[in-house]
Amino acid sequence: MKLYFRLAAGGIRRNSRLYVPYIMTCSLMVMMYYITDALSGDEMLSAMRGGYIMHELIVIGKVVMALFAAIFLFYTNSFLIKSRMREFGLYNILGMGKNGIARVMTWETLMVYVISMVFGLGAGILFSKLAELLAFKIVQGDAAYQFSVSGPAAAASLIVFAVIFLLICLNVLRQVFFSKPVELLRSENSGEKPPKANWFAAVLGALMLGLAYFMAVTIEEPLSAILAFMAAVILVIAATYLLFVAGSVVLCRVLQKNKGYYYKTNHFISVSQMSYRMRKNGAGLASICILSTMVLVTLSTTICLYTGEEQILRQRYPRDMVTMTYGLPEEDIPAFRESVGALAEKHGASPENVLAYSYAELSGAVIGNRLDMARGNSDDVSLDLRSVYVVPIADYNALYGTDIQLADGEAAAYFKGKGFGGDEIQLDDWGSYRITQRLGEFTITGTDSATIYDTIYLFVKDWSDLESLNDYQNRLTDEYGGMRSNIVYYYCFDLDCGEDSQLDLYYEMEYGDVEFPFHFERLKTECRARDHEEFLGLYGGLFFLGILFGGVFILAAVLIMYYKQISEGFNDRARFDILRKVGMNDREIRRAVNSQVLTVFFAPLIAAGIHMAFAFPLLTKILGLFNMRDAGFLAIVTLICFAVFAALYVAVYALTSRSYYRIVSGNNR
């Protein structure tokens, strides 16, 4: 037993260049999992206003973190096993049976597990309070500065990673028991035979990528964008692997046929080296590209949502207080405003910066210049479904200080989203309006700003049109199903008081037994201060997870880069020794190395940038579901994220290039 233990410890020590980054990665994965598990059980976080939403997101993030850790540790462990197989083959040739090799590998796995858990849990316990403070800071809450250790999170971490390491160990043992001694000795050099140019796979990858890009730039409906995004992600991942594995080989073959390019010293070596083992290189490059894209998508979207939270909140709630009164007669509107003013005064405030108008809401599918109102409740995403708000022109004039006059059958129009081609709109069989003006501004309702559908606002001569259209809509509802509607008085205002007083007024109006001296069907009240915490919880939770997963994805990409270049360096060293013996000097070797490493490193970054550029229209539409419709702001955030990530990428390139050169130049024997 001691012999196997010493062999395992010696193997880790001799291969410290490979094992130290692997153990650090395992420890960081343990730390991240412990932190997310500890926060998922944080009662203070879930109890604060808006914190429960972040809590639910962190619970989901904990599961995703465990799955990613399992997949990624399996992947990185394959680099270690590849480099150790020759050593184990030698043990087998010298008389150690496969059972003995299995014991050595089991001890190695156990050692790595113990070291990773000690450092990972230690770091997790140390940094969990910092993560908790960050989470509370994001949702603008007050955290207790009391240090604590989460026993359940530590136990869960021990169990989850014990299962992961057990599966890794079983996979390694499977490779050993199903291999022959000679295969173990030669496994480090397996794949040396250059793959043939697979034009079918390369063309298939190009077609799949083209289809994904086409979907990304042509999808218009936000709901369709979600489904398209999932399909595009699958296509892009598959296409990226095909193009980096098969397409890169095809490219190398094309470059080799270009004699003017290929028969230059630096190009000759780099192209021949790349083509010699491009199948393995291609898979690594594709993994780096996909992880880089995940970093950019995760960070840019979550940062955009969190930093734009105030803008989103103001779109959803245009004033401090929003009221929607259903079925309020036109003649009772002044009395309603008086009653609301009296309630506000009771709480030491008065309405100001008022936004008010009445509307009748219609819905239907636009076909040509006709609104088919019978299809208003259809779930067919292929239809051009619209909401239509019909507003008296007098309300618009009062809001904007204009004096637009309309005759019977005339309307002014404002469009949220897509416009309307013709100058006349037919509202089912009710009648039609001739559009005389297209207005450039209007403050839409908060509920409409939260919807995914395009909206038409029609400003008509007087209130009687609202009543007639509302009656017609309800007749269709009775015939085809759906909810009956009422004319709505939309009354919003700011308050010259603190949030506590605003909340008191909100709760009295929404839930209190307030008596109004007139009749209406229903009163719905919304308060920006009340939902501010929920917005922070949602967008803050996504931002927090974005930071965690962005960091994990960056770590994964960096580690794959490192392992790939180190393993390539050891494999290339013998070939560069041959080149040195036939007369190449160190300067020529360094130039050839730089050419190869530049290609290896920056192809994934460039491809990730292209993926992100084509994904941008889809991401814009998906963020629209979260009320973030500022594409310019998203573009700025995305460019900043790309610039920062590219700078980090270049720094990793500089470090890896030196390590690779030291190995192939023989300075690290």
Q: In which residue ranges do the predicted regions lie?
A:
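Basic-flanked hydrophobic alpha-helices used for secretion and membrane insertion
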Residues: 312-326, 330-555
